[in-house]
Structure formats: C-alpha cells, structure tokens
C-alpha cells in the first residue's frame, strides 16, 4: 500500500537517480546515523542498466558525510552480489546469529 511506502521513505535516508528530470533509480538507507545502516530498495530501471549508474549511486551513498560513522552496513539482495562485494559486503560471518521476524501486514 502507498501509505506504507510513503512512511518508509519518510523515515529513511533516500537517494534518487534522475535522467532528464525522470527518476530512473533509487536507494534508501535505514539508519541511526551512528552505528547501524540497512541498505534497501536499490534499483536502476532496466533500460538504464550497464551505464555505471549503480556504481555512482553506491559511491554517493558511501561517500555521503552523514553516513561516514556507520560501523555496520547490512542488506538483503537476490542479485547484484558482485556490485555489493566491491563495497565490502559479504555473507555474514556468523549466519547462525542472524534472525528475522516477519509480520503479515496486508
């Protein structure tokens, strides 16, 4: 639902990628701006992939002054592992310590 999407955006550090005033990419960081950050909802529209835009988006995020003190970055992804590995992401050292809780909301 749009209401949940809007609330998630309001409570995140968001970055958009634009071409001729049209949004073609996006990423958001859920963070306390001190220790932890969760990278989420990263995308570049398919017709704009292969142009280095994902790299520019990641560079912008990881170089942003407000995000320099983050000690632990996390993400969940089904693809683009190669891109994220270039920024130091890897499988959890102790996956048995990672837990999640899902709640059906709609």
What are these regions (language model features)?
Residues 55, 69-102:
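Conserved active-site alpha-helix within GNAT-family acetyltransferase domains
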């Amino acid at each position: 639902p749009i209401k949940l999407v809007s609330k998630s955006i309001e409570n995140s550090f968001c970055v958009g990628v634009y071409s001729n005033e049209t949004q073609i990419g996006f990423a958001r960081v859920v963070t306390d701006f001190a220790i932890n950050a969760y990278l989420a909802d990263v995308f570049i529209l398919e017709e704009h992939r292969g142009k280095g835009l994902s790299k520019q988006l990641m560079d912008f995020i990881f170089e942003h002054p407000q995000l320099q003190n983050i000690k632990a970055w996390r993400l969940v992804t089904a693809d683009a592992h190669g891109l994220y590995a270039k920024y130091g992401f890897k499988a959890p050292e102790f996956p048995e310590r990672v837990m999640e809780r899902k709640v059906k909301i709609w």
